[in-house]
Curated annotation (Swiss-Prot):
Strongly inhibited by FK506 but is completely resistant to cyclosporin A. It catalyses: [protein]-peptidylproline (omega=180) = [protein]-peptidylproline (omega=0). This is Outer membrane protein MIP. PROSITE patterns: FKBP_PPIASE (PS50059). Its EC number is 5.2.1.8. The gene is mip. The keyword Isomerase applies. InterPro entries: INFPOTNTIATR, PPIase_dom_sf, PPIase_FKBP_dom, PPIase_FKBP_N, PPIase_FKBP_N_sf. Disulfide bonds: none annotated. GO terms for cellular component: cell outer membrane. GO terms for molecular function: peptidyl-prolyl cis-trans isomerase activity.
Length: 233
């Protein structure tokens, strides 16, 4: 979070605080409605992020800044306060992220350890696991080939994060342009096959977060139907 964004967010929360005493029925102009909407949205975000701010003092700062009154803190003092706030917030977010990554890794390892002994599960040296649902008889793709597939991706708790069914059409891509777990599995699948593939975190997105339901070090499960293979020229 850059300093300007931090300052803008605090100002927005102050707007929300200042408007809190105003009856909602008095929001008669577009300016009032916009001001309140921005303030309320930022206020909710601050609350969700656990940022502890005194709304009354914040509103006082906004009022002084807008009126041109003598500020209680100097510009240098405010710069130092905001800089510390930014550093503390980043440290907190980093600690939360690392904790989540460790938890996801432990859960994923435990899941894969239990899953590997289930009937029909094949475990590869890389740690990738798969189960053949329907065995196809077509060609197997190479790394440079293009495939068309239908798939559903879930977390180990069953949360669906992606699906071609939702998109309404199959996906087409080069085998080498997907996560390592997919690249490895696809090269073993004959066209026409349907597999359930269990992808360890290090063969998926690893310790980074890609947004949405997929957090750091998530083990992912895919049901993949390989429709066709187009050989590279």
């Amino acid at each position: 979070m850059k300093m300007k964004l931090v300052t803008a967010a605090i100002m927005g929360l102050a707007m929300s605080t200042a408007m809190a005493a105003t009856d909602a029925t008095s929001l008669t102009t577009d300016k009032d409605k916009l001001s309140y909407s921005i303030g309320a949205d930022l206020g909710k975000n601050f609350k969700n992020q656990g940022i502890d701010i005194n709304p009354d003092v914040l509103a006082k700062g906004m009022q002084d800044g807008m009126s041109g009154a003598q500020l209680i803190l100097t510009e240098e003092q405010m710069k130092d306060v905001l800089s510390k706030f930014q550093k503390d917030l980043m440290a907190k977010r980093s600690a939360e992220f690392n904790k989540k990554a460790e938890e996801n890794k432990a859960k994923g390892d435990a899941f894969l350890s239990a899953n590997k002994s289930k009937p029909g599960i094949v475990v590869l040296p890389s740690g990738l696991q798969y189960k053949i649902i329907d065995a196809g008889t077509g060609a197997k793709p190479g790394k440079s080939d293009t495939v068309t597939v239908e798939y559903t991706g879930t977390l180990i708790d069953g949360t669906v994060f992606d699906s071609t069914e939702k998109a309404g059409k199959p996906a087409t891509f080069q085998v080498s342009q997907v996560i390592p777990g997919w690249t490895e599995a696809l090269q073993l699948m004959p066209a026409g096959s349907t597999w359930e593939v269990f992808v360890p975190a290090d063969l998926a997105y690893g310790p980074r977060s890609v947004g949405g339901p997929i957090g750091p070090n998530e083990t992912l499960i895919f049901k993949i139907h390989l429709i066709s293979v187009k050989k590279a020229a």
